[in-house]
Amino acid sequence: MLTLLNLLSAVALLVWGTHIVRTGVMRVFGARLRTVLSRSVEKKPLAFCAGIGVTALVQSSNATTMLVTSFVAQDLVALAPALVIVLGADVGTALMARILTFDLSWLSPLLIFIGVIFFLGRKQSRAGQLGRVGIGLGLILLALELIVQAVTPITQANGVQVIFASLTGDILLDALIGAMFAIISYSSLAAVLLTATLTAAGIISFPVALCLVIGANLGSGLLAMLNNSAANAAARRVALGSLLFKLVGSLIILPFVHLLAETMGKLSLPKAELVIYFHVFYNLVRCLAMLPFVDPMARFCKTIIRDEPELDTQLRPKHLDVSALDTPTLALANAARETLRIGDAMEQMMEGLNKVMHGEPRQEKELRKLADDINVLYTAIKLYLARMPKEELAEEESRRWAEIIEMSLNLEQASDIVERMSSEIADKSLAARRAFSLDGLKELDALYEQLLSNLKLAMSVFFSGDVTSARRLRRSKHRFRILNRRYSHAHVDRLHQQNVQSIETSSLHLGLLGDMQRLNSLFCSVAYSVLEQPDEDEGRDEY
């Protein structure tokens, strides 16, 4: 029992080490890796090589698939190029399996020692995250060594030998057991390594070992499909395409397993080494052979998995990929893109408000719906960011986290203000058959145009972080305040002139001017986050 527990803990350590490496690499190079993958989709060979390279760096084909799935879900990458990258990722993880199974036991303690020093010394810095990567690589090498040590006494048990002795000849059964190994161990690498160890110990024959390796590859595809079972349609298509490629490859090669085993058995290499090399070359040949069929596979996956029909017209979160939460760079980018959707909805609300001011009360219902949509998106962003490990974020990531929270909150508050403004216009002006004066309406239109321009510039500053645009936004905010004050005085002058329309709508008119000032402050606050300096006039603004 203790021996079995040692094996399970070693496999768990391998999975955890892979997770640590992936997290560290994504936090240091996440943005660059996203750029590499997004730019590589134009040509199949480039996309294939990008999948290999990124997977070799992050030590996990699942991590590469996660990035690609995120792009597909956001319509940044088509399904066919994404499948090419995933095929490259399969080759990359097989190559890393070969490298990691070399005798690198001396390197494990060195990597862990140096990694801990860097990670604890400068946890939030780039060096600290590279230390995390070193710890993860050290744990992977240590786990591989522990797996070999734990398997040895297990293979000597009579009961185990009887069980594995039954794996003789039924290639489909052997492949299914290999798939089960991969699913249980949560890692095709662990399953392949276990197979190689059993082969070296003489517990299983070489043909059975090849079947188990083929099954382990199939199991990794099943595992990805299970992990994405609750994801959106785009993510499930990527996982389905990867699984079908592995299934087709398995069905093609399984009938020739005994012939391959006989041919490879003539090589003067240990059987365990041959198992590892078969794993590498099988994936390489399979993936290269499947490249010409990615377009038909993409069409087939779209036919099998269709987009879910929207049961209601309410806006729903689109970019908040839960699988990206362990990768702050990617998660923050997702949240920022969702915040831009709030900005788009806010623009629609501003346009609707202008129509209400010009006597279209039917827009009020649409504005209430948009306000509800913005509240849904804001709540989703808030809960999404709350699930991120904030204490592990680097300084720049923490600042971006706060910017996204602040911007989404400001837009949500602005939507409430616009909804209230439209309701007051409908109640106090349209329902009472009272109209703004001609000059007053022109002034409100001018403020509206300036406010809409500031909103668009604010969303650009929020997304790009451009300092020049932030300074321009700050100046525009000040000009709006001056213009608002001038129009307030102009309205009072019309009251002194006994303008009947101005007198009838005075309370509403001044209230709208104050609300527009609050909206302007909410929109333009992002400028100070980018400039990182307080506004000396900020205390005089109304919020």
Swiss-Prot record:
InterPro entries: Na/Pi_transpt, NaPi_cotrn-rel/YqeW-like, PhoU-like_sf. SUPFAM superfamilies: PhoU-like. GO terms for biological process: sodium-dependent phosphate transport. The chain crosses the membrane at residues 1-21, 48-68, 76-96, 99-119, 134-154, 175-195, 196-216, 240-260, 274-294. One of its GO terms (molecular function) is sodium:phosphate symporter activity. Keywords: Cell inner membrane, Cell membrane, Membrane, Phosphate transport, Transmembrane, Transmembrane helix, Transport. It is found in: Cell inner membrane. Its main location: membrane. It is a multi-pass membrane protein. It catalyses: phosphate(in) = phosphate(out). The keyword Cell membrane applies. Gene3D superfamilies: Phosphate transport system protein phou homolog 2, domain 2 (1.20.58.220). GO terms for cellular component: plasma membrane. The keyword Nucleotidyltransferase does not apply. Belongs to the YjbB family. Might be involved in phosphate export. This is Putative inorganic phosphate export protein YjbB. It comes from Escherichia coli O157:H7. The gene is yjbB.
